[in-house]
Amino acid sequence: MIKAVSLFTSAGVGEAYLEKIGINVVLANELHPKRCKMYKHLYPNSKMIEGDIRDENVKQQILNNIKGDERILIATPPCQGVSTLGKNKNQDSFNSDKRNYLIFDAIEIIDKNNFDFVLIENVARFKGMHFPYNGKHLNIFDIFKDKYAESYVIEEHVLNAKDFGIAQTRPRYILKMYKHGKEWPTPKKENEITLRQAIGHLPTLESGEDSGIYLHKAKMHNERDILAMTHTHQGKSALKNSVFYPRRKDGVAIKGFHNTYKRLEWDKPCHARTTNSGNIGSHNNVHPGRIKDDGTVSDARVLTLHELFIIASLPKKWDVPEWATDNFIRTCIGESVPPLMMKKIFRTLTE
């Protein structure tokens, strides 16, 4: 087994298959207590350092627990500061968001150790952002080239999960760094998997219904939203309906973006699953549905956790702890790179 260290690991969703390919994450760090608790449930043999890596005491704990035989560093700093779904969409706001400088804490861990392989993963827009470095503003690739080119091969890519056997469109920024003399090819692209291929075999469910299949239970939605979505076809937003329009309790029509209150499409990969995938009115969250005999559309609901596991490339019977709520599980999945994508990226590295 190759030993690894994981920073900003959240609940460890992205690490689900690493042990199967010979990578043992022996040390992890995460800020949020609930995510740490989830990680410990999923990976009881890994040591979790809980706390903010910017805190020197926490950082020193991480450094003290790195024994020197760890070959891989994985760093997936939080992306809220650069996500297109957040409020910060330009360089000025990026500069003022402290979350975007967590990469320098990862760099400090790299500088004080001797890893053979380093993976930095983030949202695709991370590639175009610039950081203050030696009196200049440089992108992360140029910073890494300046610091590490003598010892490492450094590559950057924007890879989309849909090209690697995952039924979800999810572009991610990947920076790979590996010692000269090692090899780490980029995995080959595969055919896309549609939503129909991924979850079309599962039984129809309406709001609140339980199929009896592991976590294939529909969330409860209010009757107003259900009515609007039963009159909305796949790929369409209920906000475009002329009559059956989403409304508040007081009857006022709800306003939103073109991709809110919107059904997914059967014959395309799923849109990227966000931390808010349990909200029927949020971005591209509603099941594609099936047209019924009366002309209405079934499955007026968000995807179930079972469906979400499949879309996220998690095991269908992923062992989530009993205390974890539906929304918390969705949040952890929405924060993470799909684990099958991580598996395929790491599977190509060689000594």
Task: Write out the residue ranges for each language-model feature.
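Core alpha/beta nucleotide-donor-binding catalytic domains of modification enzymes
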Residues: I2-N113, V123-G135
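Aromatic-acidic/polar surface patches that form glycan- and anion
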Residues: L7, A28, R99, H137, ...
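Short, solvent-exposed loop/turn segments at secondary-structure junctions
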Residues: G12, P33, P78-Q80, A124-R125, ...
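Short, surface-exposed alpha-helical segments at coil->helix boundaries
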Residues: P33-C36, L138-D142, L305
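Class I S-adenosyl-L-methionine
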Residues: I62-K67, V82-T260
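C-terminal target-recognition/interaction regions appended to catalytic cores
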Residues: E223-E351
